[in-house]
Amino acid sequence: MVRGTKRRRSSAEKPIVVVPVTRDDTMPVDEDLVVGESQCAASKPFAKLVGVRRGISSIDLADDHFVCGRGSDDAPTNFNFSQVAKDVGLYRFISKIQFSIDRDTETRRIYLHDHSRNGTLVNQEMIGKGLSRELMNGDLISIGIPALIIFVYESADADHHPEELTKKYHVTSHSLGKGGFGKVLLGYKKSDRSVVAIKQLNTQFSTRCSRAIAKTRDIRNEVEVMKKLSHPNIVAIYDWITVAKYSYMVIEYVGGGEFFSKVVDSKYNRMGLGESLGKYFAFQLIDAILYLHSVGICHRDIKPENILCSDKAERCILKLTDFGMAKNSVNRMKTRCGTPSYNAPEIVANEGVEYTPKVDIWSLGCVLFITFSGYPPFSEEYTDMTMDEQVLTGRLIFHAQWRRITVETQNMIKWMLTVEPSNRPSAVELMSTQWMKCADCRTAKQDILKSIKPISAAAPAALQTTQAGPVKKAKM
């Protein structure tokens, strides 16, 4: 039995197949311990280590003990990482014996045992030298630091995801987020190992607006909206696959987390991001909304949680996401939906009167208010008025932190939060102001242009729908 494990989870019986291991000129390996393809041909693989970093091969696992590390005469390994010896950023973290993968002969469970002082991580959690962790299908294996992901562990008999998805993508168990419909998982495209986000939606859950069953056609609406969009500040969609009660949307991976986390980061002392950084982000969001409205799309749920950061840097590219409530603005919009503290007065009134894309401008004003100040413009914490009353009257309270924000910026926020829609600016009007022509906005524009590059994962994808009948495909 394997001792010192950090977790135990139920797992079906699975098998170590190894690819031929070449000798590293500077790190000799004991060839007696290196199993070639012919030696393990009789053993059926119980699992695979899928290489997701450039230069690292995938490894079939069929034996009960498999060792990974740099290797040496006194520390033989089955896989010695010689393929990435020139990848200094990774190779410097690899120990002679980094980790081993062991199959318990009694329980048939699979464990990763960490042998390295630099550390081995599973799902971005450090195991610790001398400790073990049970491996489950889709687990991520990293070396040294969370960002250095090298393998995805795939069980041979795993059936968690449909073949229509797994034949094109490696789906990990690493969660990027959860919502009312399902979850978002980290994935990799098999053709080029490019990283993607896979949004798994349970079509038996209710929709956020109508509380009705979320039919495939409801999700198709979101997909159809996203298909029309191509902008560096908007998350791209690559693929859509629907099988039985689940739909899978394969979208652009954005690794910096939610913008909300940045806004409330303790390093800003709940005082907001300030004038310079706030305007840097304001330009990006206004540009994204300007584009959406120019192609006839109203988002209807703009909030910090639906804005993603490209990375953890202080100045990063923002990406607008979650188009579940988006609608073609040519069609009539009357539904009360969205998030209460970011909803425009005309939505809150809910009098059955049509509203316009200017509801997005109001929501943007709310986002920028909290961006500059660190607190929301409308809140249930104000006990003198209900949330709806605050919104319907446009009551704003400017606390002390606004003293470091220019009057010009304060006036722009007030303009966006004008109760009467006809007096509220459009995205075109906002972008045309002198406020958007400052040095920080010019820097933002330059950074956006630098970020534009071909996305390999966006190579021709197909919409796939598998229900009662055969798979139907349509070019995106």
Curated annotation (Swiss-Prot):
Residues 66-127 form the FHA domain. Its EC number is 2.7.11.1. GO terms for biological process: cell division; DNA repair; mitotic DNA damage checkpoint signaling. One of its GO terms (cellular component) is nucleus. Keywords: ATP-binding, Cell cycle, Cell division, DNA damage, DNA repair, Kinase, Magnesium, Metal-binding, Mitosis, Nucleotide-binding, Nucleus, Phosphoprotein, Serine/threonine-protein kinase, Transferase. The active site is at D301. Its cofactor is Mg(2+). The keyword Protease does not apply. Highly expressed in germline tissue. It is found in: Nucleus. It catalyses: L-seryl-[protein] + ATP = O-phospho-L-seryl-[protein] + ADP + H(+); L-threonyl-[protein] + ATP = O-phospho-L-threonyl-[protein] + ADP + H(+). ATP binds at residues 177-184, 199, 252-258, 305-306, 322. InterPro entries: FHA_dom, Kinase-like_dom_sf, Prot_kinase_dom, Protein_kinase_ATP_BS, Ser/Thr_kinase_AS, SMAD_FHA_dom_sf. The keyword Manganese does not apply. Belongs to the protein kinase superfamily. CAMK Ser/Thr protein kinase family. CHK2 subfamily. Serine/threonine-protein kinase which is required for checkpoint-mediated cell cycle arrest, activation of DNA repair and apoptosis in response to the presence of DNA double-strand breaks. May also negatively regulate cell cycle progression during unperturbed cell cycles. Phosphorylates and inhibits cdc25 phosphatase, preventing entry into mitosis. Required for nuclear reorganization and homologous chromosome pairing during meiotic prophase. This is Serine/threonine-protein kinase chk-2. It comes from Caenorhabditis elegans.
